[in-house]
Design a protein with these regions (language model features):
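Helix-to-loop junction immediately C-terminal to a conserved catalytic motif
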Residues: 51
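Short coil-to-helix segment of the ABC ATPase nucleotide-binding domain corresponding to the Q-loop/switch region
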Residues: 106-114
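The feature captures the beta-strand-to-loop junction immediately N-terminal to the Walker
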Residues: 36-38
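Conserved ABC ATPase "signature" region
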Residues: 66-70, 75-80, 124-143
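Conserved ABC ATPase signature
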Residues: 105, 146-156
Length: 157
């Protein structure tokens, strides 16, 4: 069975600060893993490296058995080989950011459907239908046409 996520010997530093030190882990499909650590220990950086919001200094990341292809640029920094591969893999991953990051000028529903329309290229009417279903699932469908400023902190999350 192919692993959902496999990380091999991942390293990431910011200047002289080594944040991720030769980390390896495997998560099988359906398996739940927890990443626990103190503030500043690299948990968010690890997730950002998996999504390539940050590029690791070295190591390999596999998503559903597929290696994210990286190469060194002229300065020796790792960069993705194929942006199409990055976009495709990102469309299969999810990440909840520490901050709410809702667009204040967009309604709740517009915030929910923005990524599916632009990243996954889902048709707007399909995204709206799915968006309402998701809002129903978390109990805030009645807030679909309101703006984030009208939601509680928990509802925004």
């Amino acid at each position: 069975m192919t692993n959902a996520l496999e990380i091999r010997n991942l390293k990431k530093s910011f200047g002289n600060l080594e944040v991720i030190k030769d980390l390896s882990l495997t998560a099988k499909k359906g398996e739940v893993i927890c990443i626990i650590g103190t503030s500043g220990s690299g948990k968010s950086t690890l997730l950002r490296c998996v999504n390539l919001l940050e590029t690791p200094d070295s190591g390999e990341v596999y998503v559903n058995g597929e290696l994210i292809k990286m190469k060194k640029d002229k300065n020796g920094k790792l960069i993705p080989v194929e942006q199409n591969q990055v976009d495709r893999i990102r469309s299969k991953l999810s990440m909840v950011f520490q901050d709410f990051n809702l667009w204040s000028h967009m309604t709740v529903l517009q915030n929910v459907i923005e990524a599916p329309i632009h990243v996954q290229k889902i048709e707007k009417n399909v995204a709206r239908k799915n968006g309402y279903l998701l809002l129903e699932k978390v109990g805030i469908a009645e807030k679909a046409d309101q703006y984030p400023s009208k939601l509680s902190g928990g509802q925004q999350q």
